[in-house]
Amino acid sequence: MSYSVSAAQLWSRKLAMQAEDMQQHQKSQSNQIASCLAEMNTKQEVVNQTIGQLGRSISEVQQQNSQLVLQSLNQINMSMQQVALGIQDYASRINKLEQTMSDMNLKFEALQKEQNSNTKTLADCTSQMTIITKKLDAELKKRYMTTKQTRTVQNQTMPRSNTTTKKRVLAIDFLADDDY
């Protein structure tokens, strides 16, 4: 029996060694699983942090984009208002300019009518002056002829100078022009 005890001992030792090997194997597998789980947890935390950072970044970018869009829309709105005001100002200036032009056209037409009437008046005055000048010339010739024919002997000895006669003719013309 000692052989069988020894076989039983061997067998129990073998089983104990196998159990110990299995325990160590399970322990190493448990350690590997624990380290794998720890690594997965750390990686999950990194992923969660990255996802959180990405989420925050996305929300920040969305906020910035929405702010930029709002600012751009406000600037466009202000620009449109300025353009509208500019157009209104331009339209009022054009209206004033058109009004000024129509006023100037009316004044120009009035000036043309006045000029036409003045031209007619001037033409009438010129024709009247021509008639008056012809009459005066005729009267002067008559006077000159009568004065020459009725000269006395004393006057004939002292002939008049040309300048005195010219002065008299100019004086008569001057008086005729002023309607004296």
Swiss-Prot record:
<dbReference type="GO" id="GO:0007131">
    <property type="term" value="P:reciprocal meiotic recombination"/>
</dbReference>
<keyword id="KW-0469">Meiosis</keyword>
<protein>
    <recommendedName>
        <fullName>Meiotic recombination protein rec15</fullName>
    </recommendedName>
</protein>
<dbReference type="GO" id="GO:0005634">
    <property type="term" value="C:nucleus"/>
</dbReference>
<keyword id="KW-0539">Nucleus</keyword>
<comment type="subunit">
    <text>Homomer. Interacts (via C-terminus) with hop1 (via C-terminus); the interaction is direct. Interacts (via C-terminus) with rec10; the interaction is direct. Interacts with mde2; the interaction is direct.</text>
</comment>
<keyword id="KW-0158">Chromosome</keyword>
<comment type="function">
    <text>Required during the early stages of meiosis for meiotic recombination.</text>
</comment>
<dbReference type="GO" id="GO:0005694">
    <property type="term" value="C:chromosome"/>
</dbReference>
